[in-house]
């Protein structure tokens, strides 16, 4: 659940450190969070995130299921419209993801191109 925790840490007060002890490449998505304006860096098995008041919209690419979900959550709190590409990753693990978020009040839509 690191991507979702990092999405939250991006806008939380203070500094957060998230550790991944198994799969170091799991932090690849942090570069996409940085595209949204996140103050984050990775160092081996750790990601350090300094919370900021507001993320900004940007096009981002999902590299896997959880990274995609985390990017969608970050995009929901970003200022403006965020496009998350390669959402087929999300579809593999979270059926009806968009519909569930909409039912919770999220301003999100799937755009087919």
UniProtKB/Swiss-Prot annotation:
It catalyses: phosphoenolpyruvate + UDP-N-acetyl-alpha-D-glucosamine = UDP-N-acetyl-3-O-(1-carboxyvinyl)-alpha-D-glucosamine + phosphate. GO terms for cellular component: cytoplasm. GO terms for molecular function: UDP-N-acetylglucosamine 1-carboxyvinyltransferase activity. Pfam families: EPSP_synthase. Its main location: cytoplasm. Its EC number is 2.5.1.7. Keywords: Cell cycle, Cell division, Cell shape, Cell wall biogenesis/degradation, Cytoplasm, Peptidoglycan synthesis, Transferase. Pathway: Cell wall biogenesis; peptidoglycan biosynthesis. UDP-N-acetyl-alpha-D-glucosamine binds at residue 22. GO terms for biological process: cell division; cell wall organization; peptidoglycan biosynthetic process; regulation of cell shape. The keyword Cytoplasm applies. It is found in: Cytoplasm. It is an enzyme of class 2 (transferase). Disulfide bonds: none annotated. Belongs to the EPSP synthase family. MurA subfamily. Cell wall formation. Adds enolpyruvyl to UDP-N-acetylglucosamine. This is UDP-N-acetylglucosamine 1-carboxyvinyltransferase. It comes from Mycolicibacterium neoaurum.
């Amino acid at each position: 659940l690191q991507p979702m925790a990092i999405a939250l840490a991006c806008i939380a007060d203070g500094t957060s450190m998230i550790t991944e002890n198994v799969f170091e490449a799991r932090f690849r998505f942090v570069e996409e969070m940085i595209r949204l304006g996140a103050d984050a860096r990775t160092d081996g098995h750790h990601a350090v995130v300094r919370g900021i008041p507001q993320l900004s919209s940007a096009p981002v690419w999902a590299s896997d299921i959880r990274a995609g979900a985390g990017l969608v959550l970050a995009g929901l709190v970003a200022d403006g419209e965020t496009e998350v590409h390669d959402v087929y990753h999300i579809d593999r693990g979270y059926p009806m993801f968009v519909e569930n978020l909409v039912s919770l009040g999220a301003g999100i839509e799937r755009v087919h191109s």
